[in-house]
């Protein structure tokens, strides 16, 4: 498996299919009105069976093409292929893509005054000096709008284990040998391992999101040692395998995406918990970008309507309800309380509270699928896989 292929996107396609079907590329709903925007996005951007509710809310027509899991494909298509002609807007494949696209002149700088919901963004994103400011900026200029975010953590089966956990340590503890799993992707797995090793004092790692070569080697060798000792039941690939591992009881704890935990808990009818790890988590957001060519074609008005809708509590609460993802925006609790007939308000407020607890952990590290030493990450991850 190519390491740059970010596995979350495999889940995005699979989850959308189970939640109502993935539309064929380039669909334009007949009943939609307003300006048309050609959108190339991950299916997770649509928390509805069709785009029609979003189109009605935004006042636009969406001609949608589902986006694949490959970051390599996205870079190739938008930088040297026909992507700029085919699409007006597109989503990313993980942290750092906005830098590559802006640097190569693919995407347009954004005018935030054209989005009335821009001020709903949390300070850590909106403030140029905020912790997450980099995730939507290039050279201090804004090029992207976030639509979902999370802090990935550890899921554990409290029904089986009989207690709560607030540390990554049990994932590497021989007590649970053969009953734990991690993701088959160097990004999240090496990042959370680096967070644990650094915060527990076992290694000194300056930047857990962008490690130096010797740090990459140290983290990989730790994983190799654990793997050779039989610590891991497996390294999971894709949403369905993750759900099956947890729901079946084949593993009792696993690093994973929050929707995997939510679906597995329901499938197993057990108390499978998504914890808050005291060492930290991999934090991320996904973004939508406007191509420069689309701005020249006059599609920018439709883009700002799309982006503004993504920032609205109407959209973010529906993302939370359907997929368990939140947003780096405010106003969700007020919206939930104002629309109790549309949501399980108590459950979603509890989910948001747990997210806030994870966001607040000092040791968190931001997702980065384009680290400076990418080749070293790839080479050492290959050794982990082969061990």
Regions found by a protein language model. Name each.
Residues 1-19:
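N-terminal secretory signal peptides and thylakoid transit peptides that target proteins
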Residues 33-100:
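Early extracytoplasmic/lumenal segment of secretory-pathway proteins
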Residues 49-50, 178-189, 309-334:
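Periplasmic-binding protein-like
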Residues 72, 94-241:
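Extracytoplasmic ligand-binding site segments that recognize negatively charged/polar headgroups
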Residues 74-86, 100-104, 170, 240-250, ...:
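Short helices/loops that flank or line small-molecule/ion binding pockets
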Residues 154-160, 196, 285-299, 318-319:
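A bilobed periplasmic-binding-protein/Venus flytrap-type ligand-binding module shared by bacterial periplasmic
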Residues 231-296, 341-347:
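Extracytoplasmic/periplasmic substrate-binding proteins
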Residues 317-387:
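C-terminal capping/gating helix-and-loop segments adjacent to ligand/active sites or protein-protein/ligand interfaces
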